[in-house]
């Protein structure tokens, strides 16, 4: 079943429980390689990418049980320092295995990872960080080989371009290095805070995660522990958009409003009434047509690139014209050609798109090419006139737990075919 059949023209209303963050769970899963003690991780979303990460750990020899969103992990039996290509090629997050395997075995070999086809997403920043700490790196056509003859040594490392991936790689490598490492120009995403919190639970000494300067004082060893994954802020934003574009009402539960300040500000600017509590967000757009908004993506705490496609959809059915500028990834407007097929008026100008609102979108057979674009097309199908078919849906299954089921509970009519 690789297609969705969506009956459109629906208002989406109700309550939704937000799942754990995929982008926090993935690095945390791979950080378990750093300890030989038992780990329990809760609030783990049931996703394709998570399943591949579990398979990767098992391929190395880890013992893992997945029960009711809880993962019980024992990596004490890991003996292999090179995960299989058929798994690493499927998710880009597999690059986060490099540093933990290197530290544990003194060597590691990782085939070049895969994932969404959004721009170049180079891994050179990961490599530069490891070299600065003392690793020897050989980069071949299809794989990265790393080795050390003595423990890594803490250094002051400036990451040239803000990178979540490189920040996590250097932070994990420095956890068991000798001395103190200072990461300058570090990414500040909530998922980095959560990864650091997990490592600190195991005995690491990390200060400053969530700021642009992180201090890591190396420790000799890590212990076991328990950790709960933070809520998925992008899933939260996606469901808020679902209600906003359908003139609906929604309450997102088990989420973190503080991680969505820019998204909530833009939704409010579009005309939505927003209320928040400790772990919930309420949006009310009943009886209103969204106003167009202008957005420019930037690293956290700026506007998230992963919410750009969803807001392009909102602008496409808004009252006037809005511009969205993408500053993180090139080639992230692939989805717009499919929205245009559905009647959207979108023009691409360099790294920006201009969306002129139309009264309605209309059903089409559309094809998804990446995770967030795929989710956007599903939402477009929910509000379009007629019946829409979305093909190649494995993309949204990588990052949204029970997405169609949750939408159906809000009033959508989505079926797998």
Swiss-Prot record:
Biological process according to GO: cell division; cell wall organization; peptidoglycan biosynthetic process; regulation of cell shape; UDP-N-acetylgalactosamine biosynthetic process
Keyword Translocase listed: no
Residues modified as 2-(S-cysteinyl)pyruvic acid O-phosphothioketal: 116
Reactions catalysed: phosphoenolpyruvate + UDP-N-acetyl-alpha-D-glucosamine = UDP-N-acetyl-3-O-(1-carboxyvinyl)-alpha-D-glucosamine + phosphate
Its EC number(s): 2.5.1.7
Gene Ontology terms, MF aspect: UDP-N-acetylglucosamine 1-carboxyvinyltransferase activity
Disulfide bond annotation, renumbered to this chain: none
Tagged with keyword Cytoplasm: yes
Localization (cell): Cytoplasm
Keywords recorded for this protein, A-Z: Cell cycle, Cell division, Cell shape, Cell wall biogenesis/degradation, Cytoplasm, Peptidoglycan synthesis, Pyruvate, Transferase
Active site positions, chain numbering: 116 (proton donor)
Gene Ontology cellular-component annotations: cytoplasm
Binding site for phosphoenolpyruvate: 22-23
Function, in words: Cell wall formation. Adds enolpyruvyl to UDP-N-acetylglucosamine.
Record protein name field: UDP-N-acetylglucosamine 1-carboxyvinyltransferase
